[in-house]
Design a protein with these regions (language model features):
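Conserved nucleotidyltransferase catalytic core and NTase-mimicking acidic/glycine-rich helix/loop elements
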Residues: 26-163
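A surface-exposed, charged beta-strand/loop segment in the N-terminal or early-internal portion
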Residues: 1-19
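Membrane-interacting alpha-helical segments
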Residues: 14-30
Length: 163
């Protein structure tokens, strides 16, 4: 990011401090946050499954939005991504997971970025896949106290024929 005006040089110092920040002291908290987000999105999975079963577009889309937003935040925080601009948010997260990964394909489909799968049913199914892949990616980070919720949610997704 280019600093436009910095008469006394303080902005340059602040910018450098942000770029040099060491995330390692926060990694355990970031891991915990990611595990909490996966568990918390079990509710969104239930809403998506229910909406798909009932053919209720608004339920699926709103729950998909919540799930995708939370999974993006979980990855960004857990990986300690420095978001240099909101315009790079999605790029940085996709790059950190891998542009050609199943996770990125599921994210893009759930977010409606796949022109061949823009119907709400496809987006809901992609969101369920995104949840499953995020839960698997963060499996070691999910605390034992949340394990039953996440495992039950994963079972429901598979039982419903998704993932």
């Amino acid at each position: 990011m280019k600093i436009v005006l910095d008469k006394d040089g303080l902005m340059s110092v602040l910018q450098q401090a942000a770029q040099d920040f060491d995330w390692s002291s926060l990694q355990s908290a970031a891991d915990e946050y990611a595990g909490e987000e996966v568990m918390g999105c079990a509710e969104e999975v239930h809403k998506i499954l229910n909406g798909l079963t009932r053919g209720h577009e608004s339920t699926v889309l709103y729950a998909t939005w919540g799930l995708v937003k939370s999974m993006l935040e979980a990855v960004a925080v857990q990986r300690g991504l420095m978001i240099v601009s909101e315009n790079r948010y999605f790029d940085l997260i996709q790059d950190s997971v891998g542009r050609d990964s199943k996770w990125t394909r599921a994210f893009r489909a759930a977010w409606g970025l796949d022109p061949t799968a823009s119907q709400y049913q496809s987006r809901g199914a992609a969101a369920l896949t995104l949840y499953s892949l995020t839960a698997a990616m963060f499996d070691e980070l999910i605390p034992e106290k949340h394990r039953n919720v996440v495992n039950t949610t994963m079972h429901l997704i598979k039982e419903a024929g998704y993932s």
